[in-house]
Amino acid sequence: TVEGEVMPMAQELGLGVTPWCPLRGGVLTGKYTRENRDKIEPGRGDRVKDYLTESTFGIIDELSQIADAHETSPAAIALAWVQGRAGVDSTIIGARTIQQLESNLSALRVELETDEIEALDEASKPTLSFPIPFLEMAHNLMHAGATVDGVPSESPVLLPKSDEERY
């Protein structure tokens, strides 16, 4: 995935990334809600139906709540969040109308608070595919509770906690 492989690689190598389709084809604009999910018009709406999962609605809810606090659109919040990500140099927007363009450009005036960024990070945290989850726990498996180079590790739950448990 981009989140699991490309972004970490780009950050490690000092490369900039330009995310494409940061509003997921309009899904993150606030246009689609749980209440209207069954009333989406055919045509353009057909291509977004598969993205309208409970997880996505959680992101939309968070974007809408933050947008209300900033008196702006969910799209502006989503774009401000993406643009503030480490390693992101620019974003590609896909506005079809002047109103959408103005909404997207208003993201340049948004300054998100730390707690808002953390909430969006948590709401949009991707499920990474193998081997990422395995690699994330490798440090703990290798060092089994020891501190190495000043970095502490946790003892995996499968390992014995004492000599009595070993034998």
Residue ranges and their predicted role:
Residues 2-39, 73:
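Aromatic-lined glycan-binding groove of carbohydrate-active enzymes
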Residues 12, 38-69, 84-88, 102-167:
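Terminal-tail/helix-coil boundary detector
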Residues 24-25, 84, 97-98:
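Short, solvent-exposed loop/turn segments at secondary-structure junctions
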Residues 27, 100-103:
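Phosphate- and divalent-cation-binding pockets in alpha/beta enzyme and binding domains
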Residues 58, 72, 96:
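Residue-level signal for the nucleotide or nucleotide-sugar donor/cofactor binding architecture
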Residues 77:
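Glycine/threonine-rich phosphate-binding loop and adjacent beta-strand/alpha-helix elements that clamp
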Residues 80-81:
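Hydrophobic, secondary-structure "cap" segments at the distal end of domains
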Residues 89-100:
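Glycine-rich phosphate-binding active-site loops on the catalytic face of alpha/beta enzymes
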